Structure formats: structure tokens, C-alpha cells
């Protein structure tokens, strides 16, 4: 197969030619992205000239807010008016509606319409630019009523008018209550709205001072061409498209996949009213996009979701299947991880999905990580393999054994196409300010907090970040009904069950529902102890935090996500819990002092009542003995 230059196939939009990158290095980009069969030689590139290292918004076209002129502020929303080619960056959680003109976001053009888009822009990730653009629709848009409502003169030279509102999940930014180190995760006090006293918004306009401290997202030409090619192939294929992206740590895998999702779901022809969908296989338990922490999953995404950015797994897409790994790293339980991956991809094959799918993989490309990549490659059988290359990973990628052809449930025989493009380390959120630097462990802890403090019972995520010890846990019986099995590592199998139960207090466990009944165990009131290999009949439901165990009355006091309570009740009384390595957030066991002082309700400490004459220790504060006077 002859090599094909993707530049010739990429869509050329007159208003988007200068949005792929703001750096001069991309203008001088010499290496061409190549697509070929695996058995053909791949061309190399000069990594120093291709990497985009200047991820800053140009001051020439930067939006400069001025209240009363190009910015109108109301109680629950703001109106932003942009002239031609003006661009800005917004952080936080917000809903966006285009009232006039259009905008460019990640090289995707959007027209004014009645649609509302939902954005999740934490400062732990690189922030995409929002750039004004023209209206390219066929239908007339009447904006006169909108102008009248906001006292905007109809005779203005603004190309784009945006309405920005608080996100329905505004309470997600309150995570700093338990983790003060994340106080600048979504917005900072130095940006426009916060600095000028408008503190009721869940978002902010990032000012130049903050822009110098954070990373803005810029998609290079090589990435743009590759993304467009993948979309083009999917649109013109009568079979399914399976995309596997391989790269090292901070190479931009998650960013590339997020851009691919947006390209596939939201970059339609103007007249196309159909709903697009794709399947997302989340195989990175340490940095999952949609899974629970320490889990892998298969998720269905549709163009009706309208979600952009990093939602920390709170965007509420349809999770089709989920497996608990028990650790953020596949390295801790490698056999278990590979078994779960095999099960998940088997579930994917059984769906007979004829659209586009992609895989989010860990950035482990050395040693056993290569074995994982090889195994996933063999069972997923990708139609397209994207290598995010850097000088340190090219050698490891060459060790992968790519078959010349695959056969799947959807196609009898096909050869995988390969793409070698440079990794974009410049898009990694390497922030300069100590206040907006976030360790991966802090982000993992935050995801756990979001899971356990989600308080909604609908598809609109809401959060209550009061400490869990200030709330009453749920009671789940154990023994004959309720939780009838504890699953542990094989090395603890001989530990007596009553000691295991006590050891679970204060730990995070996985909660399963046993789909097949065991009549023999139904007659026993004791709880079973099984090894991790005995999970064939169990379905993972959610994570739980064990508060305490009442061995006399035989029930667990356990915290579970509020939005999962109804699901657990509907499933009946046959549950299993599994303890592995997921760590309990320390801030749940010992919340910041100011949090406990401001909490007006008594924390749930114990279910035991003292006996009538039971001694109570009382601390005397007025003791002044000789030994105390030094």
C-alpha cells in the first residue's frame, strides 16, 4: 500500500487555519504524518522541530474584558462579545450557548443555535482556547429579542456573542472544603470575575497573569491531520473502526482521545441532524476518563451528551460495563488486570458495535507495560494504531509485534493502519505557580471524593462535600442476607472471618451483586471468605467506605455514593464486598479542623450506648500541680 499524505485529506476551513497552534515551530513543521500498512517502513521525524512548546495565548488577539462594553454580567450568567479572531480561555464549570456567529474549539467549528454545551475546564489540564468565528448555517438566527433583553445595540461589530452560565454541577468546585490543596483546581482569585467581586460563578475568565502560569491546549498540525483522517476513515467505512493510541507518560494520550471524541461526536455537517455515538474503552485505572477510581470500563458516548473537557468521571455517560482492578497501577495486580481487560474486550466484541471505538491505555511502555500493550493489541484487534512518539519511546514501540492482518466479528480480514505522530509534551499541564500545581495522587483522591460525595439521584451531578463522618452511613446486614461474602487476596484466606470483618473498618471496598444464587449458603448465617479468583458470578456495582461493623447485630455501617443507593436497594439482598488496595482519603478520616468546627450537626461516631454506670473520662483543665510549674 502506498503511503498517503494526510495533509491532502485534511479539511481546510478558512477560519481555522491559524488555530492549530500558536507557535512558530508548527509553521515550520517539516515532517509529514504517514499512514501505511504495518509491514512497510515508517518514516521518522525531528522531534525538536515538531513539538509545540509555546502554549500561550497571543496578546494580539486575546479578549480583554470590559464590563458594559464587551462583557455584560447578570446574577446567573454573563454575556461575552467577541470581535473577529478574538479568543479567550475560561476555567471552571460552565454552560455555553452561542447566540450569534460561531466559535472554534479544538479546531471544531460550532454555529449559533439553541444548543447548550457543557464544559469542564480544571486547571490541572491544559485549557483549550475559545475563538470567535463566522456563522456558517443555512437558517436565519433572530437575535433582536436577545439584544433587547441585555440592552445591546444591534448596530455593533461583534462577530460572536456567547452566553455563559453556571454549570448545573457547580457544587463540584467545593471539593476544596476537604482538600484545601485543590482550592485553585477550577478557578483562581486572580482572574477577572473573582478579582472584581463576582464570586457567585463556577467559572472565570483567565487573565494574562494566570495564562503565564498555566498551559493552554494547542493542537499541532500533525495531530489535526491525523484526527481528521481517522474521522474520514470512519465516515466512509461500512465496518467498525477500532482506534488504539499508544504513548508514554504525559505524551498526550488522554488529550488526543478527548479531541478524537469531540471530532467524531460534534464535528458534523451543518445539515446533519443524526445522533453520533462511539464506544470508549477506559483501560487506565490510574487516570480513568469515565470509570470509577481504580476501575476499567466500557462507555457509550453520544452527540447528545454535549460534554467537553475533563469531567473527572462525573459527566454521567452510559457505562455499559465496569470492572474493579483495585489499584491505580496495573503493576500491582498484573494477572488480574489482564484478565479484566480480556473480559471487557470480550464484552465489547459481544456488542457487535459497527461504529467507532477507542481505547484509553496506561502510559506504561516499558517492561511489563509492553506485555500489556501486546495483549491488548492481540485481543482488541485495532484497525488503526496511533503512536505518540518521542525519542525515549521509539525503541520500545519497535518491540511490539503487530500482526499483518486481523479477523474480528465484524470483518473477516484486515490490515491495521499505523500513524506515527510526535507526542505533545507541551500540552501536559506543567503549571508554574505552586497554587495550581496538582500531584497525580491528589487528583486520584479528588476523584474518590467526587464519587462518595455525589448526592444527586438524577443525571444532573450535585455534590455535598461535608465530611462523611458528619453523615449517617447506610446499614447493610451480613450473613444469610445482605453481604454474604468477603473477597480478599489469597494470602489472607486463612485469617478468621471475624478478624477480617474488624480489619475492614475504615477501608474502601468494592461492592458486587451476586447474580447466581447459592442455596447451600442460604442456610448458613456465617459470612463466607473467598479469594479474588471467585468473581465469576459477581457484577461490580460501586465502591463503599466501611465506617464500622456491628458484630452483635450483624450489619455493616458503610458509606456508598448517594446516587447508587436506589440501585443497591433494587438489587435485593445478595452482595459481596472485596478489599484490595484502594486507599481511603485521609481527609475523610481526619477532616480539616475548620470543617468540623463549622459543621452544626453531630458527627456519627458510634452506634453503641453507654451502660447506666459506665465510667466516662472527663478531662480536667484546671490542674496545677508542682510538676506542671517548670
Swiss-Prot record:
**Cellular component per GO?**
Las1 complex; nucleolar chromatin
Where exactly are the transmembrane stretches of this chain? Answer: none
Database matches in Pfam families: CLP1_P
Q: What is its EC number?
A: 2.7.1.-
Q: Where is the protein situated, by its record's location annotation?
A: Nucleus, Nucleolus
One example GO MF annotation: polynucleotide 5'-hydroxyl-kinase activity
- Indicate whether Metal-binding appears among the record's keywords: no
Q: Extract one GO BP annotation from the record.
A: termination of RNA polymerase I transcription
Which Cys pairs are S-S linked? none
Query: Where ATP is bound, by residue?
Result: 247-254
Q: Any keyword Transferase?
A: yes
Task: Provide the top EC class.
Answer: transferase
Q: What is its main location?
A: nucleus
**Secretion signal span:** none
Stretch list, region Disordered: 1-52
Keywords (A to Z) from UniProt: ATP-binding, Kinase, Nucleotide-binding, Nucleus, rRNA processing, Transferase
Among Gene3D superfamilies, the record links this protein to: P-loop containing nucleotide triphosphate hydrolases
SUPFAM superfamilies per UniProt: P-loop containing nucleoside triphosphate hydrolases (SSF52540)
Function statement:
Polynucleotide 5'-kinase involved in rRNA processing.
Its family? Belongs to the Clp1 family. NOL9/GRC3 subfamily.
Q: What is this protein called?
A: Polynucleotide 5'-hydroxyl-kinase GRC3
Amino acid at each position: 500500500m502506498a503511503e498517503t499524505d494526510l495533509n491532502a485529506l485534511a479539511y481546510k476551513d478558512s477560519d481555522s487555519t491559524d488555530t492549530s497552534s500558536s507557535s512558530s515551530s508548527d509553521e515550520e513543521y517539516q515532517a509529514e504524518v504517514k499512514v501505511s500498512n504495518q509491514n512497510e517502513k515508517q518514516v521518522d521525524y525531528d522531534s525538536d522541530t515538531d513539538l509545540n512548546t509555546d502554549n500561550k495565548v497571543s496578546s494580539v488577539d486575546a479578549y480583554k474584558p470590559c464590563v458594559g462594553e464587551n462583557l455584560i454580567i447578570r446574577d446567573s450568567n454573563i454575556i461575552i462579545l467577541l470581535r473577529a479572531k478574538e479568543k479567550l480561555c475560561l476555567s471552571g464549570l460552565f454552560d455555553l450557548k452561542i447566540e450569534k456567529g460561531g466559535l472554534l474549539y479544538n479546531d471544531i467549528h460550532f454555529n449559533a443555535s439553541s444548543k447548550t454545551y457543557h464544559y469542564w475546564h480544571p486547571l490541572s489540564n491544559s485549557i483549550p482556547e475559545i475563538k470567535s468565528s463566522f456563522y456558517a448555517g443555512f437558517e436565519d438566527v433572530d437575535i433582536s429579542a436577545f439584544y433587547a433583553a441585555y440592552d445591546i445595540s444591534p448596530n455593533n461589530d461583534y462577530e460572536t456573542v456567547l452566553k455563559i452560565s453556571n454549570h448545573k454541577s457547580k457544587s463540584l468546585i467545593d471539593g476544596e472544603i476537604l482538600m484545601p490543596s485543590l482550592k485553585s483546581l477550577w478557578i483562581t482569585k486572580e482572574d477577572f470575575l473573582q478579582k472584581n467581586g463576582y464570586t457567585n460563578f463556577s467559572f472565570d475568565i483567565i487573565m494574562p497573569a494566570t495564562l503565564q502560569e498555566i498551559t493552554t491546549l494547542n493542537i499541532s498540525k500533525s495531530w489535526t491531520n491525523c484526527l481528521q483522517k481517522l474521522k474520514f476513515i470512519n465516515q466512509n467505512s461500512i465496518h467498525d473502526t477500532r482506534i488504539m493510541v499508544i504513548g508514554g507518560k504525559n505524551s498526550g494520550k488522554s488529550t488526543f482521545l478527548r479531541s478524537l471524541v469531540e471530532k467524531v461526536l460534534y464535528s458534523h455537517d451543518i445539515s446533519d441532524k443524526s445522533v453520533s455515538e462511539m464506544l470508549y474503552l477506559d483501560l487506565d485505572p490510574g487516570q480513568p476518563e469515565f470509570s470509577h477510581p481504580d476501575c476499567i470500563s466500557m462507555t457509550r458516548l453520544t452527540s447528545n451528551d454535549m460534554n467537553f473537557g475533563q469531567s473527572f468521571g462525573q459527566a454521567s455517560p452510559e457505562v455499559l460495563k465496569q470492572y474493579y482492578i483495585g489499584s491505580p497501577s496495573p503493576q500491582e495486580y498484573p494477572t488480574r488486570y489482564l484478565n479484566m481487560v480480556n473480559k471487557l474486550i470480550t464484552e465489547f466484541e459481544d456488542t457487535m458495535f459497527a461504529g467507532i471505538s477507542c481505547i484509553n491505555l496506561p502510559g506504561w511502555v516499558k517492561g511489563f507495560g509492553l506485555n500489556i500493550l501486546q495483549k491488548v493489541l492481540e485481543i482488541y484487534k485495532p484497525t488503526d494504531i496511533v503512536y505518540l512518539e518521542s525519542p525515549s519511546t521509539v525503541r520500545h514501540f519497535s518491540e511490539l509485534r503487530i500482526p499483518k492482518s486481523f479477523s474480528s466479528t465484524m470483518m473477516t480480514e484486515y490490515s491495521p493502519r499505523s500513524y506515527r505522530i510526535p507526542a505533545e509534551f507541551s500540552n501536559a499541564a506543567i503549571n508554574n505557580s505552586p497554587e495550581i500545581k496538582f500531584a497525580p495522587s491528589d487528583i486520584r483522591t479528588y476523584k474518590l471524593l467526587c464519587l462518595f460525595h455525589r448526592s444527586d439521584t438524577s443525571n444532573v451531578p450535585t455534590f455535598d462535600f461535608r465530611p462523611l463522618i458528619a453523615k449517617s452511613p447506610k446499614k447493610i446486614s451480613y450473613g444469610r442476607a445482605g453481604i454474604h461474602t468477603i473477597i480478599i487476596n489469597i494470602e489472607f484466606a486463612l485469617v478468621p472471618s471475624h478478624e477480617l470483618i474488624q480489619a475492614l473498618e475504615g477501608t474502601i471496598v468494592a461492592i458486587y451483586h451476586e447474580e447466581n444464587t447459592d442455596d447451600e449458603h442460604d442456610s448458613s448465617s456465617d459470612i463466607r471468605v473467598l479469594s479474588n479468583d471467585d468473581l465469576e458470578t459477581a457484577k461490580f456495582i460501586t465502591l463503599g467506605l466501611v465506617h464500622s461493623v456491628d458484630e452483635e447485630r450483624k450489619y455493616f455501617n458503610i458509606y456508598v455514593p448517594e446516587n447508587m443507593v436506589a440501585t443497591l436497594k433494587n438489587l435485593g439482598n445478595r452482595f459481596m464486598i472485596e478489599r484490595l488496595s484502594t486507599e481511603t482519603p485521609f481527609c475523610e478520616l481526619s477532616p480539616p479542623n475548620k470543617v468540623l468546627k463549622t459543621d452544626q450537626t453531630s458527627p456519627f461516631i458510634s452506634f453503641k450506648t453507654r451502660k447506666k454506670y459506665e465510667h466516662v473520662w472527663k478531662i480536667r483543665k484546671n490542674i496545677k500541680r508542682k510538676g506542671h510549674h517548670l
